[in-house]
């Protein structure tokens, strides 16, 4: 305490003096845009060849890009987009890229407004008083569409619209936006529009009108998952910029790569593992990052994502989960959906929740399984039909802590749950 008070940096001194691990941890963060993307040359070249006609003021084909999460789709498209803008500046042609994240911008109105406002660059058009800035709500959608067309026409040139996480837009607001955007070229004389849709969920195309799908997928590019040696190369390249020389034990990168490859070849996961391993070593003032830090990082990331996932569940799902925790506390390692339903009903009754049907509870159980919170399997019980069994994989103390953070489940009345009576019922 007195040390902290006497040092000018006080409490933070020890964090500033340990420079043995990181040189620049920012390069491991999600928002860092790498200049080199190992193992994505074929995809980058393909995107570039499809967009190249933009440099001679022709309309590039629309592209649909698929691939699992963390396979470098966004990073590659951004990279090609920047190169295209640079090349067009040199060639004296007009190409503009607008990148929208449809997880955030998920209605037709907002997509159209954002594209128009992306064009609405006052520096480029200082004397253009015909342009009006579209408010993010309030206008009729038709008016927004007209204004977008006007602005595209007055800008001229080629605009490439990147709709990242396009599946979220379709799920939230249907395919009207895509219908309008894929037809907009027929209404334009001086400008051209091309669309790149990016998704990690192939199923969204089932919800598209066949005409929209065929127009959107004039070209399709698939990003395969990375394997362990490829992830090693990606990590190696970032590690050189992020870590002090010699700070990483030689087993660290191969282990991060192997763990991320085992799951689904996700570069984001591999980079997170490497960054968190470094942070854990840094925090314990270690002289370097070792295998044990990677193991700790793996556990921390898993627990953090589980906590995040459970804390955002609705109260009914948490009540179902709470029923499973009670069954576990009663000494059961594996429980059936029938048992969960009995305990759940007791809980719902005590805390005045609407009591769900067995069918609905089974749906919530399947959802918990899909989220990886529990494991389930269906077993046949001969003439009694089939039933679902479930169990927890990991220690449940963290799950209980998160579930009981819900004010409805942190109820004094729940402490009166008659476990002995329940136990007798399952005998
Ligand atoms: N080949 C690569 N070289 C270097 N870094 C990469 C490479 N591929 C991906 N990354 C990095 O991994 C992270 C995830 O990549 P990106 O966001 O491009 O994935 P994505 O396929 O778009 O994922 P999602 O579908 O989840 O959005 C980013 O930090 C990115 O910089």
Swiss-Prot record:
Annotated InterPro entries: AAA+_ATPase (IPR003593), AAA_22 (IPR049945), Cdc6_C (IPR015163), Cdc6_lid (IPR055237), ORC1/CDC6 (IPR050311), Orc1/Cdc6_arc (IPR014277), P-loop_NTPase (IPR027417), WH-like_DNA-bd_sf (IPR036388)
SUPFAM superfamilies: P-loop containing nucleoside triphosphate hydrolases, Winged helix' DNA-binding domain
One Pfam family cited in the UniProt record for this chain: Cdc6_lid
Record keywords: ATP-binding, DNA replication, Nucleotide-binding
Molecular function (Gene Ontology), one example: ATP hydrolysis activity
Coiled-coil stretches noted in the UniProt entry, renumbered to this chain: none
Listed SMART domains: AAA, Cdc6_C
Cited Gene3D superfamilies: 1.10.8.60, P-loop containing nucleotide triphosphate hydrolases, Winged helix-like DNA-binding domain superfamily/Winged helix DNA-binding domain
GO biological process, one term: DNA replication
Highest taxon above the source species: Archaea
UniProt keyword annotation of Nucleotide-binding present: yes
Residues bound to ATP: 71-75, 226, 238
HAMAP family to which the protein is assigned, alphabetical: ORC1_type_DNA_replic_protein
Family the UniProt entry places it in: Belongs to the CDC6/cdc18 family.
The protein's role, per its UniProt record: Involved in regulation of DNA replication.
Name of the protein this chain belongs to: ORC1-type DNA replication protein
Organism whose genome encodes this protein: Methanoculleus marisnigri (strain ATCC 35101 / DSM 1498 / JR1)
Top-level taxonomy: Archaea, Methanobacteriati, Methanobacteriota, Stenosarchaea group, Methanomicrobia
């Amino acid at each position: 305490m007195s040390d902290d008070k006497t040092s000018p940096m006080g409490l933070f001194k020890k964090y500033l003096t340990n420079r043995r691990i990181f040189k620049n941890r920012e390069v491991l963060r999600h928002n860092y845009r790498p200049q080199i993307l190992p193992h994505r040359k074929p995809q980058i070249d393909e995107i570039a060849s499809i967009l190249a006609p933009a440099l001679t003021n022709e309309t590039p084909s629309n592209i649909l890009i698929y691939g699992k999460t963390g396979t470098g789709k966004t990073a590659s498209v951004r990279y090609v987009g920047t190169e295209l803008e640079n090349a067009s500046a040199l060639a004296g042609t007009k190409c503009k890229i607008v990148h929208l994240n449809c997880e955030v911008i998920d209605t037709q109105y907002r997509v159209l407004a954002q594209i128009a406002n992306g064009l609405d660059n006052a520096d480029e058009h200082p004397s253009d008083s015909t342009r009006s800035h579209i408010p993010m709500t309030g206008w009729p959608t038709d008016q927004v569409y007209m204004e977008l067309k006007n602005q595209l026409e007055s800008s001229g040139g080629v605009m490439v619209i990147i709709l990242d996480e396009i599946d979220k837009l379709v799920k939230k607001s249907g395919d009207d936006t895509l219908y309008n955007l894929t037809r907009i070229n027929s209404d334009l004389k001086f400008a051209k529009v091309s669309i790149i849709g990016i998704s990690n969920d192939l199923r969204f195309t089932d919800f598209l009108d066949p005409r929209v799908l065929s127009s959107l997928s004039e070209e399709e590019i698939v990003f395969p998952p990375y394997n362990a040696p490829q992830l090693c190369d990606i990590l190696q390249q970032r590690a050189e910029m992020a870590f002090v020389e010699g700070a990483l034990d030689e087993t660290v990168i191969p282990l991060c790569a192997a763990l991320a490859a085992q799951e689904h070849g996700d570069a984001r996961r591999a980079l997170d593992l490497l960054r968190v391993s470094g942070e854990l070593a840094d925090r314990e003032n270690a002289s370097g990052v070792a295998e044990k830090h990677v193991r700790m990082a793996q556990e921390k990331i898993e627990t953090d994502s589980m906590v995040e996932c459970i804390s955002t569940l609705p109260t009914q799902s948490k009540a179902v989960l709470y029923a499973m925790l009670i069954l576990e506390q009663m000494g059961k390692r594996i429980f059936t959906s029938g048992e969960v339903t009995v305990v759940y009903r007791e809980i719902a009754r005590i805390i005045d929740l609407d009591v769900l049907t067995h069918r609905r509870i089974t749906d919530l159980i399947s959802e918990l399984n899909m989220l990886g919170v529990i494991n389930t399997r269906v077993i046949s019980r001969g003439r009694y039909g089939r039933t679902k069994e479930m169990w927890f994989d990991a220690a449940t103390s963290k799950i209980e802590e998160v579930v009981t953070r819900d004010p409805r489940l942190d109820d004094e009345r729940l402490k009166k749950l008659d476990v002995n009576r329940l136990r007798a019922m399952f005998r």
